[in-house]
Structure formats: C-alpha cells, structure tokens
Amino acid sequence: MKFKSELEQAIIATVQQEVVPALGCTEPVSLALAAAVARQYLGALPDRIEAKVSPNLMKNGMGVTVPGTGTVGLTMAAAIGAIGGDPNGGLEVLKHITNEQVAQAKQMIHDHKIEVSISDTEHILYSEATLFNADQQVKVRIAAHHTNVIYIEKNGELLFSKPCVVESENAENVFANLNAKDIYDFSLNVELEKIRFIQQAAILNSALSQEGLNQDYGLHIGRTLQKQIGKGLISDDLLNRIVIETTAASDARMGGANLPAMSNSGSGNQGITATMPVVVVARHLVASEEQLIRALFLSHLMAIYIHSKLPKLSALCAVTTAAMGSCAGVAWLLTGKFEAISMAISSMIGDISGIICDGAANSCAMKVSTSVSSSYKSILMALDDTQVTGNEGIVEHQIDRSINNLCAIASRSMQYTDRQVIEIMVSKPKSL
C-alpha cells in the first residue's frame, strides 16, 4: 500500500499522541489532574474534596499506589493532585510533589476530608473533582481521555465547556481503512527520522525496568525471577530476560516508583509491554539503531491499531493486546517476515484471549509476565512453521478477522463481566 502524505502524517501523529510519558497508573493520575486543575482555579488549598469517577476508573484506581506517596487509592490521588499537582503536567501531573505535600494529603485523608464515589456517567473513562474552600468551590470534569478536560465551573459559573463525543461513536479513526499488513509496511518504509522519537520509549521504560530490578516494588516479580537465576532454579535465557526486564518495569510502575513510563493507548503497562521485549531482543541480536527504531515503532503502532478496536477501558486486560504489538516487533527482528507476525499473533489470540482486567494493581505485573511469555512462545512456534489455525476457536485464517473477533468479544460480550468484576471489587470487606 502506498501511503499518502496526509495519511502518513495522521499515523505518526496518532503514535505521538498515544505514546507519551506518564508518571503513575493513568486512571488515578486522571483524577489527580482534575483536582490539580480545580486547585488552580480555586486559588487556595481546599478544605475538602468531593470526587466522582466512572465505574471503570474506580476499578483501575482502587488498588494501585499513587507515585511518590506510598499510598494506595483514589483518595490519595485526589488529595495529592489538589495539593501538589501540576495542572499543566498532563500525565506527569505528580512529577514535582514533595514529602511535605504528601504529608498534607495524608492528613486530609485522615481527617475524612476526601470523598470518592462512583458517577452514573455514559463515559467509560470519567473523573470529576470538586474542591471547596470556605464559600468558594470549583468543579472540573475529565472524560474520554485521561487528560481531556471538558468542564470547569467556579461558584456555579461555567468557565469552560466543550462537547465530548462518547468513545464508541468517535468516527475519526485513522485505522478505519488499514489492516495489520499496512501497519507492517508503514513501519518498515516510513522515513527513519520521522519515527526516531520512538527511541524515547526504550530509554524511559528501560530505566523503569532497572529501578524494578534494584528495589522491591509491588510484587517484585522481575526481581524475584532474577534471584532464581542465581539459585539455578531458572535459566538466564532470552525468554526469561524478556519476562524479567519487562515485568520489573511493571513492578516499579505499579509499586509507585517516581519514574515515568512511556505509555501506549493511555496505559503505562501497555507501553512497557510494547517496549521492553523489543529492547531485550534487539540487544540480544546486536540489532542496528534503525532496526531497533523500526521494531519499536512497529510494536507500538500495532498495539495502538489493535487497541483502537477496543473501548478505552474494558474487562479485557489490554497488556495482552500490547504484547501482540511487541510480538510483531520481535518477530520482525527475528525473521523479517510479516507471515511470522501473522502466525504468532494468531497463536496469541488462541492462547491468552479473555484474560480479565480486575483493576490496576501490583498483580498487573503478573499479567504482563503471562502476556510476553505467550508472545515469545508464539513467535517460536512461527519459526517452526506452526500456529493456532483458523479451524480453532475464535482464530480465523486471516489475522485481521482474528483481531476483530477478539475485540468484538471484549467490546460486547465482556461488558457484563466488567460489571461483575466492579461489583465484586467495591463490595469486598475492607482489610483490617
């Protein structure tokens, strides 16, 4: 396929929009940003905060550590966003918070000054923060995307508003007339200088991986597996290096490390999963700089392409689809053939389809480990000319039909699953 200039620009712009630095899990960060913007308009520290979030944002904010605070949950996200957040920081809203501000936020929580509840909203991704100080109050709403401020109100006066198209109705999809082979062809033929920016993903996520190997964050799965090599319980081979280095980055991210991840489709874990396997394999192969750049771009673009067929948040764990992106990048590094990519992604769909998202938490690193393991296993099968065939399950003989089948299940059939997961999570008894 020959890509017109306008389409080329649109594809690159989409990657630049979806692959951005993010400090901390992006759902609580979205609420922190709403609170930070509200504080900017309030002009003073709040006496109390009322926050409302969509069910999916509640699910993804309940069990994850807010970076730089050592504290789990949306109450901390709202408090620290209002006290120390940078309203212009986007997904790095909490980059410059101080220990003193964290202490202030914890005191507000201790004094029961923060209330977070579920909003009855049409938006899958929605956060609202209302800050109060004496007789002043400011309300800010974010919807559809993690940094998309759609509403600002102060003391009942509307200061800013813009329409927000429901995610599923968004017609402006750059991938509408593209398929997986087009994604592959574009990544290999686009001018190198136009996609060099993707190298930053390797830099940021490699630093996060090293942080996860240096300290115990979250479930410290990567660090645990690294220790087992020294004990002779697992081997120091390419598969385990992929798993260890990718999972360590997720450990650090979910465990509250004060380092940004390069995200993909609004998720740090998806960005990590789309990046680190490619970095590890490129290093193993002593790949050239151009090979690394193109493999990274192919990985991230394929991940975005697949995720574009999904709701922004759903019951399907999206690191599985991000791993299909890195599957493409790694398979290209090892074979240079689209056929291997097609075979491997088909096998992944036959393997890990249906892994549920039960909220952002330290256990996300387990799903990262599972997904990248499936990816490499599927690539090895393709190298041996083997794959899950179109005669089995939801896999079809054509890769895009298989991808569409997976995403249809996530978008439709798994919506009840999502509601059930959220119901279970919000009704669990609090730990003592």
From Swiss-Prot:
Source organism, top-level taxon: Bacteria
Gene Ontology molecular function: L-cysteine desulfhydrase activity
Gene Ontology BP terms: L-cysteine catabolic process to pyruvate
Leader sequence segment: none
Annotated HAMAP family: UPF0597
Family: Belongs to the UPF0597 family.
This protein's name: UPF0597 protein APJL_1638
